[in-house]
Each structure stands twice: as structure tokens, then as C-alpha cells.
Amino acid sequence: YNKLKTRTFINNMSRIGNTATDRFTFKPRMNTEIRGTTHLKCFQEHKEKLFKCMVSLKYKKITNAAVLASIRMRIGSVNQFRPAYAKFIYKKYNSKKVLDISAGWGGRMLGAMACGIDYTGFDTNLNLVEPYKQILAAYPHEGTCKLVSVDSSTVDYSTYDYDTVFTSPPYFMLEKYEHMPTY
């Protein structure tokens, strides 16, 4: 987070900040279902195939990164929005008050925190309420961050003050979020 906050120029494809959100939202992401399974179930049910994949990918050691790479090759990945890209967008458009109708894994919020700007995010995934609180508590920031656990399609946006709307809609057709309705 400190690198994300202090660097004045960050390549918009940078992964800086990803581990800051992973620290709190990695587990719910790994419990998100894609292609009929989760990363955890894939590991439990296909260890032998995953190890063969690691060998074919020429990993010399079995590490968390090697296991994740093998799982992603098998079923795909549940990606987070890069906080560095969010920061890039906020800086480019001189954002001061961001509205995010689908807060997701916290990447856009972390980008706003690193910029010291206000952020209001909506998300119905109740499994993320505690991780959001943990992110806010873990990283010092100047702007106000507000997270609201409601369906953003029911919100009266005229009651909010914002100069930027920036979001990444959920991938309901590809991902099934834990304890969430299927659309």
C-alpha cells in the first residue's frame, strides 16, 4: 500500500497494491465459483493433475504461486481490479469523490485511499463487509471511504456527492459469488 500511495507515477498495468487487497479478500475470491468449482475445491480434488501441470510449467519448487498458476490454468481465475489502475484513472481525471456501484474486491477503494480522495462503494456481497473494514483499518488514508451493503440498482444517486463514477461490474455469467443470488 505504501508504494501505491507514495509513487507519483505508476504504470497503469502495475500490480502495486494487489497484495494489499489480497491480504483481506483473497479467501472470499478463492471461494468464488467458476466453471462449477472453486480454487480450493480444484486443489482438493485435482492435486495430482495440478502437480503434473506444475512440472510441465517447469516450476522447480512447489510454492503457493506455482499451485495458483496451475489452478488458474485448469479453471481460470477470479481477478481483482488493480488498485494501481484505479489510482491512474483517478489522477488522470482529477477525481475527488468516487462513486463505485460494484465495489468488488476493494481495488478501486484502495486506489482512492492511496490518492487521499473520497470513495463510496456499493456491494451486496456480505462476505466482504469485514474485509472492507479490515482494509480501511490497516491502511492510513485521508479521504472518506464509505461502503454500503445494498443492491446498487435500488440507490437514489441524487443523494450522493460525486464527480467520478468508476466501477467494474460483477461477472455473474462467469463467477458465482459465495452466498449471493444467481442472476
Language-model regions, residue ranges each:
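Long, acidic/serine-threonine-rich intrinsically disordered regions with weak helical/coil propensity
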Residues: 1-33
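Class I S-adenosyl-L-methionine-dependent methyltransferase catalytic core
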Residues: 1-4, 29-183
